[in-house]
Amino acid sequence: MSLPDTPTLALACELISRSSVTPEDAGCLQLIAQRLAPLGFVCERIDIGGVSNLWARRGSARPLLCFAGHTDVVPTGPLDAWQSPPFEPTIRDGHLYGRGAADMKSSLAGFVTAIERFVAAHPDHAGSIALLLTSDEEGVATCGTVKVVEALAARGERLDYCVVGEPTSVKTLGDMIKNGRRGSLSGTLRVKGRQGHVAYPHLARNPIHELAPALAELAAERWDDGNEFFPPTTWQVSNIHAGTGANNVIPGVCDVLFNFRFGSVSTADALKARTHAILDRHGLDYELDWHLSGKPFITGRGQLVAALGNAIRETVGVETELSTTGGTSDGRFIADICAEVVEFGPVNASIHQVNEHIAVDAVEPLSKIYERTLRALLTA
């Protein structure tokens, strides 16, 4: 690997070299805190349940602009499928390769170097700057950002703006900002029947047969029409299981896992109620447990979207697109204490894949976009 030629690239390489497979942090937060402390940041570790969390803040005034992200990465997959070791950052053909290069250690490096330059140029800037970082985003995400948000809320700390460094760009750096995400509501359904011999169906009740019409109705249901920010709500079955494995036994139960992805038109409670109404109408004997892993959030065209969009245009000459597509992120937790939350980072085409990479010539511009956003929001 040739030596990194910019501070952001050097820090990205140092972070990638740390094997922080979720929920491990591998010293990434300590490294970042060591860079922030000399700038006047108060760095607070909020470690919970084996998860490493960092809340670092400079200043006490409003507005508060927070950069948020995660140090953990997904597992590498088969090592022999990588062209170079995943935790040995390698520059090849104009790209930086390594696990976390795009998701999201280059963003973390960009946060830090953007802040360093901004504070050097504006030591008496308006408002406050913060970083909220966790090692529990790629895993179960129960002891990470959500717990830090709870701790901040308990002591009355609120954010005005938050940029989550998720890799949102599609084809080129800056072409997409996520200004919201759909909610995710999962159901675990068990329909009860009566087990019996397939030759004597009159002595049994087949839960698969009883459930099938209800599933068809749920699949055909139009839950809402969406709105300007979100597509219509979707309902999908992810798993169905019934039976003993024998072909002569009618099963006694049928288990189904399903999921809603929903925007701001429908609420989780409304979707639950409509689901129960359909199941009840079919006369099923059932149990249904729910898990809401994230509520939808949306940030309109306010100050943060304008500042970030202008920063992208000034840095890379791209007119960005706002989108709410894709899965959930930690933005869903931060939205509880922050009025304006967006996600922005590098191209996501290689994330969670072998040979994950980011274009070398996108690393420094990413940091400059973050710096220009700081300047727009925290200088007079």
From Swiss-Prot:
The active site is at D72, E137. Zn(2+) 1 binds at H70, D103, E166. Binds 2 Zn(2+) or Co(2+) ions per subunit. The lineage of its organism: Bacteria, Pseudomonadati, Pseudomonadota, Betaproteobacteria, Rhodocyclales. One of its GO terms (biological process) is L-arginine biosynthetic process. GO terms for molecular function: acetylornithine deacetylase activity; cobalt ion binding; succinyl-diaminopimelate desuccinylase activity; zinc ion binding. Pfam families: M20_dimer, Peptidase_M20. CDD domains: M20_DapE_proteobac (cd03891). Its EC number is 3.5.1.18. It catalyses: N-succinyl-(2S,6S)-2,6-diaminopimelate + H2O = (2S,6S)-2,6-diaminopimelate + succinate. PROSITE patterns: ARGE_DAPE_CPG2_2. It comes from the Bacteria. This is Succinyl-diaminopimelate desuccinylase. Pathway: Amino-acid biosynthesis; L-lysine biosynthesis via DAP pathway; LL-2,6-diaminopimelate from (S)-tetrahydrodipicolinate (succinylase route): step 3/3. It is an enzyme of class 3 (hydrolase). Catalyzes the hydrolysis of N-succinyl-L,L-diaminopimelic acid (SDAP), forming succinate and LL-2,6-diaminopimelate (DAP), an intermediate involved in the bacterial biosynthesis of lysine and meso-diaminopimelic acid, an essential component of bacterial cell walls. Its cofactor is Zn(2+); Co(2+). Belongs to the peptidase M20A family. DapE subfamily. InterPro entries: Bact_exopeptidase_dim_dom, DapE_proteobac, Peptidase_M20, Peptidase_M20_dimer, Peptidase_M20A. Homodimer. Keywords: Amino-acid biosynthesis, Cobalt, Diaminopimelate biosynthesis, Hydrolase, Lysine biosynthesis, Metal-binding, Zinc. Transmembrane segments: none annotated. Zn(2+) 2 binds at D103, E138, H352.
